[in-house]
């Protein structure tokens, strides 16, 4: 198998987001959100706001992003997307700091593993509230702000191939991600008149340090074996597709879901 497939090479930025401003939720730490933030700066964004529920991790990520990219126009604000007041505060903060947000990346989500037969309502509700309702809250208020300022924008949502596929112990997460897909399509139709494009990525397996620490090694090997490349995607590989959807290169696309997946073996 080609070494480029098993050991992908990080691609330099090409100015896809030159001069744009970006807001990303759940962007602290070492996952897709921080990879997207790093990629956005590398692709030329002029300013960025990132959020997370963990204050300490968020502050460290802001400092790291500044240090690694050299961009000083980086801000962070704690936000729990299940809280409408915090959602509004985050978007207002970004609109103020960025002078209008060009790109919103809805990355916040929550996943756990449990058989449906053993699941309590509270466990189901928590995953749905963060993953689906949180994306809805961010999208709704952002569209209200865009309408008020009469300036178009782009929204990129983080869905999952589990919105299409079945997997044991993932009924709540899969239902939430399928909802994100439906939300993406329907809100995209409504947002056309506002000059807003809304699309989503649907990763299959994105491997990051937290997953490697939390997932049983046997399960991780099983999941990676299902991918044709024999590995999960690097977080920056998912972020690359987010950057395409956030850029003018996807100007004709709205309401679309792009899988970030190798063909299942």
Residue ranges of predicted features:
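Substrate-binding pocket helix/loop in short-chain dehydrogenase/reductase
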Residues: 115-116, 120-128, 211, 219, ...
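Residue(s) in the substrate-gating loop at a strand-loop-helix junction
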Residues: 160
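Short C-terminal tail/terminal secondary-structure segment
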Residues: 2-12, 31, 165, 226, ...
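Canonical Rossmann dinucleotide-binding motif of NAD(H)/NADP(H)-dependent dehydrogenases/reductases
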Residues: 10-49
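Active-site helix of classical SDR
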Residues: 139, 176, 184
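Alpha-helical segment proximal to the catalytic Tyr-Lys
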Residues: 144, 189-193, 251
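C-terminal substrate-recognition "lid" of short-chain dehydrogenase/reductases
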Residues: 136, 231-261
